[in-house]
Amino acid sequence: MASSAPSGRTVLITGATGFIGTHLVRRLLARGDALIVLARSPARARRLLGSEVQITSELATLGASTPIDAIVNLAGARILGLPWTRSRRATLLSSRIGTTNALVALGARLEHRPRVLVSASAIGYYGVRGAETLDEQAI
């Protein structure tokens, strides 16, 4: 279980294996923060993020006494490159709204409640780029 880092805070991050998430993880570790990462694939997250972060695949594994100072929610199913079907829309909504609701519920059950929840959709990071095709390499 992550404990508050001596020189920083404990931050829970979803979407930590994406482009913005991996950069955020590096920055927060360099700052001295302790990190808890929620990942669908803990093995992949471990390979990408290293051994300095605590990785969980289920929020339920975090006990009520887990100290979390901040939550950063970058999770969400990929938007670009797939057909815009009814099923896809349901997946997109679930991956964003469902995850956000689960994080709010986690915060409510923690003894040490997070001071902030930041929830972001990473596609906005790229800005307006016209008809240019964007992926995680386009910065």
Give the ranges of each region predicted by the language model:
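Glycine/Thr-rich phosphate-binding loops of Rossmann-like dinucleotide-binding domains
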Residues: 21, 80-82, 126-128
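SDR active-site strand-loop-helix element
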Residues: 14, 38, 71-75, 117-123
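NAD(P)H-binding glycine-rich loop region in Rossmannoid oxidoreductase-like domains
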Residues: 44-102
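N-terminal Rossmann NAD(P)H-binding glycine-rich loop of SDR-like oxidoreductase domains
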Residues: 9-31
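Conserved glycine-rich Rossmann-like NAD(P)H-binding loop of the short-chain dehydrogenase/reductase
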Residues: 33-40
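Conserved Rossmann-fold NAD(P)-dependent oxidoreductase catalytic core, especially the SDR/UDP-sugar
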Residues: 90, 101-139
